[in-house]
Amino acid sequence: MQAAPVSEALVDLADEVLVHTGQHYDEAMSGAHIHATRLPHPRHNLGVGSRPRDEQVALGQERIAEVLEIEQPDVVVVRGDTNATLSGARAAVAARIPLVHVEAGLRSYRDDMPEEHNRIETDRLADLLLAPTPGARTNLINEGVSGRVEVVGDPLCDTLERWRPEIVPAEGEYLLATVHRNYNTDAPERLHAVLECLARSPWRVTFPVHPRTRAALKSWKLAVPGNVDLVDPVPYTRMLELERGAQMIATDSGGVQREAYLWGVPCITLREETEWVDTVAAGWNVLVGVDPDAFAKALEHPRPQERPNIFGDGRAAHRIAQLVVELASSELEAAA
């Protein structure tokens, strides 16, 4: 959804070809989100679907390579840390097309996270690395990446500023929960501990269930606490309403951690680490893993008095668009 402001910023500067890999195979996770956020309709939908990571990355690379052969772009832009990100990065490098990585330099230092491997390899391949925060830039400099590094801010900040006037907080007192990381859903004892955490909430828990999580709950036959309301995945704008209206948010999602911070809603992260360390340093995000006692303690964590501006001024998309066009222009001049 963070592609929307960047696409808007590029409208008058370049011809953008938006590619949707189909990594999120559930309609509520993809098509409905694209519709809700008014993203331009993707010119190519690759239908990669759900499959083991290595297969997903390889198939995504193969199909993106076919798109690159058809479209012949001057620059390839990838964002974030998904398998699709890595597929696009590898395809661009193989085709000798300059690569831009948006959201570069983030590190959780957790080796068993596929997202961490995706980030690191993409950063090593990129020609232009666009870091959302100064800390992310520092990570890249310390790693000695070969590409050019620029701090641009977080496009997610642009997205929320765009939607803020239209997002009415959901009613009622509730804790909002999201869980989808493989290490939280693929081990029954860990997913059970997540449910034990949610059972400690003094409010009812609204839990939009990711397809991976729903399948795991069913597979492991885990009992859902009585205070937890499982609901189907919701469109992005509805998710923002739920976030804005929540008393607190419990999540293992990097995006939701940032959205919680930008809404000013305290967050409990169901991980032992986070790539968004600034939210923890500011006191708005508490890391508890899946320890129910730590979760209960975090529920009592005092709301900070201040919320520093750590994600930029809402103009990240403008900076990204300008830098992408500059890179494309320089490549064309060099080839002339």
Roles of regions detected by a PLM:
Residues M1-W203, R214-A336:
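Nucleotide-activated sugar donor-binding and catalytic core shared by glycosyltransferases
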